[in-house]
Amino acid sequence: MRFTKMEGLGNDYVYVNCFREKVYDPEILARLVSDRHRGIGGDGLILIGSSARADFNMDIYNADGSRAEMCGNGIRCLGKYVYDHGMTEKTEFTVETQAGIKRLRCILQDGRVAAVCVDMGRPDIGAVVETAVLPDETVDFVRVSMGNPHAVVWVDDIYVCQMETLGPEMEAHPMFPNRTNVEFVQIVDEDHMRMRVWERGSGETFACGTGACAAVAAGIAAGRTRDSVKVSLLGGTLDIDYDRQNETMYMTGPAREVFEGWTDIY
C-alpha cells in the first residue's frame, strides 16, 4: 500500500489516496499505521476519495481506530496533497467530511501549497458554562461543536494545567456520550491565546484546528477575545477569523508533506 505522511503544525497523519488504493478495514489500518514504534507513526489515518457532493471526500480515523468527524490540520494537508499531486488545478475547492462540506483556498508559494485557508463553518456554542465532576476535582468548561465535540477549559497557564490527568478524564466523562476533545486555553490578550489539546482517540497532540476554532468561538462568546485571534499551539500558530455576517469561522495555517512510502503492514 502506498501512503504519504503529512503534518500541519505537528499534527501528523498517514494519507492514503483511495483513487488508486483499496482500503477494506480502515479502523484496523488506522491502529496499525499510527503506531509510532511498530507502524509508520501518526495521530491517525486519512483517506482521500471521491464525493458525489464535493470535489473530494475525506474520511478520518483516530490513532485508536475510532472515527472522527473533522480535523482542521488534516483537511489543510489534504488540500496540499490534492493540489501538489495534480489531482486538481483549482486553488479553491470543496471537501466532503462527516461534519459537512468544507471549502478550501490554497495559498501558493513557488507553485506549491504553503498554507491553506478553510471555511470551518458555524460554531455551535453551549448556552452556559458547565461543570464536570471528576474523581479529584470539578472543572468548568464551555461546550462547543465544530461538527465534532469540544470542551473548552480556561486556565491561567497551559503548562501547569494537569492535562495528562484532566484530559483523559474529561474525554471519557459521561457528559460526553461520544467522548470529546478537550482544549486547555490561556488568554494572553484580546488577539492572542495559547492552547494545549487532548484529542479524542489520540491523546495530546501538537495542534488541533477545530479545537482552535472552538476556543476562539468560546472566547468571543465570553467577550474575552476579538474576531481575529492568533492561537499558539505546541506545534505553531493558527490564524482564526470569525465572520459575523455569515457566522462562520475561518482557519489559516501551514501544511507540509513529510515523506511518501510503501508498506506491507496491511
Regions found by a protein language model. Give the residues of each.
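A glycine-rich beta-to-alpha transition motif near the start of alpha/beta enzyme domains, typified by
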Residues: 1-112, 152-266
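Extended Lys/Arg-rich, glycine-bearing segments that form polyanion-binding/interaction patches
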Residues: 98-137, 144
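C-terminal domain-closing interface element
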Residues: 123-128, 132-137, 143, 248-266
